[in-house]
Amino acid sequence: MTDICNKCHIIKQIGVGAFGTIYMVKYDDKYYAMKIQKIHNWQTKPSTEHNIWREIYFAKIMSKYPEQFSKIYCYQLINNCSHVQPLYSKYHRKRIQSLSKSKYCIKMIFDIKDGIIKDLMKNEHLTDKQLYSFVAQLLYALYIMKKHNFTHADIHNRNIAYKKTNNKTIKLGDISVNTYGYIYSLIDYGNAIHPKF
């Protein structure tokens, strides 16, 4: 799977966050999400002191729950990175300017989702049954995190993704819940909290 990191081709940009940019990429006729994030040279050594490595640590553990979280396929530290992070918010201007001087970035490849809940709720009117399914799926993801002693610490409408499905139900522990056309998952784990951190 590490070939994905080296041989994927960028199709288009699909998202911009405070510190990273998300692209749709293609490898071996399959689509993935690639997150590129600039880091300082003192963040290049893996350590859960830094948010980027916390995100990778969290994603690796939660990859066994691909319906509730994004599966990470690979990650790669890049030297001489030419990525330019767009300014997402004036609040982050100083940090982005500081990072723009760095020559390092991290590239992570995740499974791709169809979109984020913010856009889904803006473009479609979800029924009460769809909202019930959304809440049940989100609570189950929170339960899984609690079971592994994690807190997401950054849940909002841009960090909840969805995937359209023809499956009628999704298994949440011992029960099956109707999907009503969508499977929801948490994304963006850079602020994850764990006792190990």
Language model feature labels by segment:
Residues 2-28:
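ATP-binding glycine-rich phosphate-binding loop
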Residues 21-81:
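ATP-binding glycine-rich loop module of kinase domains
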Residues 70-128:
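Conserved structural core of kinase catalytic domains
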Residues 124-153, 157-158:
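Conserved kinase catalytic-core helix
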Residues 187-192:
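Activation of the activation-loop gatekeeper triad in protein kinase-fold domains
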Residues 194-197:
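Active-site Asp-x-Gly
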